């Protein structure tokens, strides 16, 4: 069975998008101070600026007609949970929970998947160790063609599991 998730590419009309707000992902300046260097950020995020940028982006998405789904906080998530594209893999049949290459991000797919599943979006699979796969390394060309980059976040085993 296939579902209409809209465009499975990076240039078509965006119908639905799942985002986590900076207020949820970053939570507080204290949390930013405790995590940003451990997570290898180049500089310290500015919580207030990030919140303002998010409001602007969300307004643009809303004006374009996209349905914005706000992802919740989750125990053990880090600042990186703001970058939702990495921790979500959408296919024509539903979501696949990836296995993040960065160990600090491994809880994100479960939290994201559980929330989206509660909204009626099916979770059809999960990448298991030793596979690694991140949405940021994947680009849909059309509904049947997916390009995958192999590197420290996505490996051949993760791609093999996704292809099943």
Task: Kindly give the residue locations of the regions a language model identified.
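The feature marks the mature, well-folded catalytic cores of soluble enzymes
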Residues: 1-164
């Amino acid at each position: 069975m296939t579902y209409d998730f809209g465009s499975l590419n990076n240039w078509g009309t965006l119908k639905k998008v799942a985002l986590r707000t900076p207020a949820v992902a970053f939570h507080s300046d204290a949390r930013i101070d405790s995590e940003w260097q451990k997570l290898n950020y180049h500089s310290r995020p500015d919580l207030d600026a990030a919140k303002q940028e998010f409001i602007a982006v969300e307004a643009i998405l809303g004006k374009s007609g996209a349905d914005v789904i706000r992802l919740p906080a989750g125990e053990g998530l880090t600042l990186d949970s703001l970058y939702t594209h990495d921790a979500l893999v959408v296919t024509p049949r539903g979501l696949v929970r990836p296995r993040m290459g960065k160990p600090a991000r491994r809880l994100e797919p479960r939290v994201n998947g559980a929330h989206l599943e509660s909204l009626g979006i099916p979770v059809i699979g999960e990448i298991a160790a030793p596979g690694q796969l991140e949405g940021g390394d994947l680009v849909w060309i059309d509904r049947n063609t997916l390009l995958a980059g192999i590197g420290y976040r996505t490996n051949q085993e993760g791609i093999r599991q996704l292809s099943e």
